[in-house]
C-alpha cells in the first residue's frame, strides 16, 4: 500500500501531510511511528479510572497528533471528546470515547497494513 493509498483508506489528508512534512518519505516514517504513540492507551486508562485531568490531557494530545498527521476522522472525534473533557465533566464522554476508539481501531488496522507493505 502506498502512503496515498493509506490516506485514501482512512479518509485522511495526504496532500496536506506531505506538504507540511516536506516529503513522502518523511511523512511515511512519521505515520508509522504513530503505532508507538501512547496517547490512546493513556486516554483509555484515564477514562476507565475516571481521572478527568489525565483523560483531558490524553485526549488533547491524541487530537493534536492525529491532526498533525492528517488523520482526519480520529482528529475530529478526539477534538469533540477534548472539548467535553475541557469543562471537567464526564457527562457525554463515554459515547464520544467509543467513537474515538472506533476511529483509532480503524486507523491502526490500516496503519499496520501500510507498515507491512
Tell me the role of every PLM-derived stretch.
Residues 1-57, 61-117:
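Two-component system phosphorelay core
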Amino acid at each position: 500500500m502506498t502512503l496515498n493509498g493509506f490516506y485514501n483508506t482512512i479518509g485522511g489528508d495526504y496532500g496536506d501531510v506531505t506538504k507540511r512534512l516536506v516529503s513522502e518519505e518523511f511523512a511515511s516514517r512519521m505515520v508509522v511511528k504513530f503505532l508507538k504513540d501512547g496517547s490512546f492507551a493513556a486516554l483509555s486508562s484515564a477514562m476507565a479510572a475516571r481521572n478527568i485531568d489525565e483523560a483531558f490531557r490524553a485526549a488533547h494530545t491524541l487530537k493534536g497528533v492525529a491532526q498533525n498527521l492528517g488523520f482526519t476522522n480520529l482528529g475530529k472525534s478526539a477534538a469533540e471528546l477534548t472539548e467535553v473533557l475541557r469543562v471537567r465533566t464526564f457527562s457525554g464522554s463515554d459515547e464520544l470515547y467509543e467513537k474515538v476508539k472506533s476511529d483509532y481501531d480503524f486507523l491502526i488496522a490500516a496503519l499496520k497494513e501500510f507498515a507491512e507493505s
